[in-house]
Amino acid sequence: MRARAVWLAAALICIPLALPLMGCSLFNKDDDYIPENPADSLYNQGLYLLNTKQDYKEAAKKFDEVDRENPYSEWARKALLMSAYAYYQADMYDDCVNSAKRYVTLHPGSPDAAYAQYLIGSSYYDQILDVSRDQARAEKAIDALQQVVRKYPSSEYAISAQKKIGMARDQMAGKEMDVGRFYLNKRDFIGAINRFKVVVTQFQTTRHVEEALMRLSECYIALGIIDEAQTAAAVLGHNFPDSAWYKDAYQLVKTAGGEPTTENKGSWISRAFQKMGLTTSQNG
C-alpha cells in the first residue's frame, strides 16, 4: 500500500543549492547582521541529508530549522514543503500532516499547495489498516484526497488521489462486510442487514456490493421477507449478471419459493441504485 510520491519533491530538489539569501533585511535593521545559521546553508544541509544520506528524519529537522530561523521568507516556504515530504519519507505521518497542513494554510495560492494537500491524504492513506480494525484514517484519507480532486482538478495529483479514494472506499466497504458477516454468523439478521445496507447505499462502486446484495437476499430469506430477497437478487443479476454471487442469490431465492428476477421498484434496494444512476431491472 505504500506509495511514495516524489513528483514535486524531485522538482524541489533540483533547486540550485546556492540561491541568494532572501528577506534578511525585513527582519533586521542592521544590514551587516549575519544569521548564525544562514537559510541557504540549512536548506542545503537538509537536501544533502535527504538525497545523499537518505536520513529523512534529520533532513526534516533541518528544513524545520529554516522555517524557525527565517520565518515568512521564500526559504521558509520551500523548507516547509520539503519538511512535509521528508517526514512522509520517514513514515512520520503525523508530522507530515502537520507540516503540510501549515503549508496549505500559509500558502493556499501556491502552485505547490496541491502537492501539500496530496501529502496530507497520502499520509492518512498509508496508515489504513486491515478491515478488522477501525477505519477512521480511511475516512480522513478520503476527505483529504477529495480536497485534492475538488480544489486542484487539473493538477498532476488529481488522478492518483482519485485512485486512492477508490481504494480507501473499498477498504471501508470491506469493514462493513466484515462486521455484517459476523452478525450473519450470529444469526443477528437485522444487524447484518444494517451493515450490508451501508455497502449498497454508500459504497456501490466498490467490489463488495455484489456480495452485499447476495447477503441481503440471504438475510431477508431467513426473516421470511421474500419480496426484499428477490429484489436484492434481481438488482444483483441486472447489474452483475456474470457474478458468482448472483448465481448464489438466484439459487437461494428460487429455493425459498421466490422469483429472483422480480424487482420491487419501491424497495430501498432499488431506490438506492436508481439514486446513484445505476440500472435496475425492468421487472417489478
Predicted features, each with a name:
Residues 2-6, 20-284:
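Acidic, polar-rich low-complexity tracts and alpha-helical solenoid repeat scaffolds
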Residues 9-20:
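Bacterial N-terminal signal peptides
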